[in-house]
Amino acid sequence: MVKIFDADLIKGHIIVTDNGKRTLIDTGCPVDINENNMQRIPGLRQHLEGARGFVDPTLDGFWGLEYFARHKVLFDYRKKAVMVADQGDDIMVVHPIAEYPLLRSIVNPRLIIPMKIAGVERKMVFDSGACIANYITESIATTGTEAGSVFDEHPDPDIGRYEVKLFNLPVEIGGETVEIPFGVQPADIDRDVQMSGAVGVIGVGLYKNFQVLVDCPNRRLVLGRY
């Protein structure tokens, strides 16, 4: 079965209504956040409350990697739409230009893809929740061209709201080079990313510029032109 959801974009976050539940789509979240999981997994309710505080007070839950493991999910940010297919059904971006294997994370459950950034192939976490800024290790980011700054926010109250200085870096996608801005994450988050075997996180830099198909059943991520 294939379903198409209208998406609300709130502070860049992608939110759909699924069976009457307001659901934030976050590939950076290792599990789904719903009533069942909140009763058995410590910390999930606090994570949801944090997201209600800085994204949308009407949120009921998250689609995390549990959901993606069972489905193929296509993001069309410009049309404010999300298409979802069961494992046995096919969906595809309209004009595919690049396909990446989804690599295994060393420690934490993550969607990791190899991308050529600043002339070097690097492992990056695809995180649909990275909707304000993309991030990369400071030693790489600062080789780019300064591109202003933005404010981002994290549901952990110990991190909260913080300023992010941005640097444009060249990223090769489908035989073309695209300038994408990257910032530097707070040290604790950057350390967690590196423990996964990656050097950074990319989200908004992809789905604002391309349709994105996350096909976990077939271990691939496909980009398509708008």
What are these regions (language model features)?
Residues M1-Y226:
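Pepsin/retropepsin-fold aspartyl endopeptidases
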